[in-house]
Regions:
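Short glycine-/polar-rich loops that comprise or flank the Walker A/P-loop
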Residues: 28-29, 113-114, 140
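As written
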Residues: 130-148
């Protein structure tokens, strides 16, 4: 019968656990949502926004959901950005597509290191924005479509976390 070295097994399991703990060092903790009053109402109307976001995170065994701060315009966004750090800025483009693009550019000039993602209401809006991709790509990193589910916000946060953690995670794991 082969002798099993329990100490060796324990060290290997402990090492695997330690590596797992070191994966994903960057987490999105603070999100600034810029959406006009109508779009903010639409997002909240779909249900208990904060509760649903937290629920999405819990379903994936993620226990720290990001905190959302919502503002209605560029002025409000700049005010909040002066007060504290945000990991991610989500700009909602409703009927008016030009104002969110201009807002994004102004914010990028002042805060070039904060990722900005755009959220549109439907696929037609997506087509419009993709046709002017060169114009928005200077400040907006990616465009997502609001389909009535809060899961899109989880996807946006995970997109940024994966992008930032990619290099470190592939070296570790």
């Amino acid at each position: 019968m082969e002798k099993i070295d329990l100490n060796k097994i324990y060290k290997r399991k402990k090492s695997d656990r330690d590596i797992f703990q070191e994966l994903m060092p960057f987490k999105v903790k603070e999100i600034l949502l810029i959406a006009n009053y109508y779009d903010s109402y639409t997002i909240e109307r779909e249900g208990q926004f904060s509760g649903k976001i937290f629920g999405e995170y819990l379903q994936l065994n993620l226990f720290a959901a990001p905190r959302f701060t919502s503002v209605a315009n560029e002025e409000g966004a700049l005010h909040e950005l002066k007060k504290r750090h945000f990991d991610l800025i989500i700009i909602m483009a409703g009927l008016d597509k030009e104002t969110p693009i201009l807002t994004s550019r102004h914010i990028k000039e002042l805060y070039p290191d904060i990722c900005q993602l755009m959220l549109v209401n439907n696929n037609a809006d997506l087509s419009y924005l993709l046709s002017s991709e060169k114009e928005i790509s200077e400040s907006i990193e990616r465009v997502f479509v609001w389909n009535g589910s809060t899961k899109v916000f989880l996807a946006m946060a995970k997109y940024l976390e994966d992008k930032i953690n990619l290099e470190a995670d592939t070296k570790l794991g």
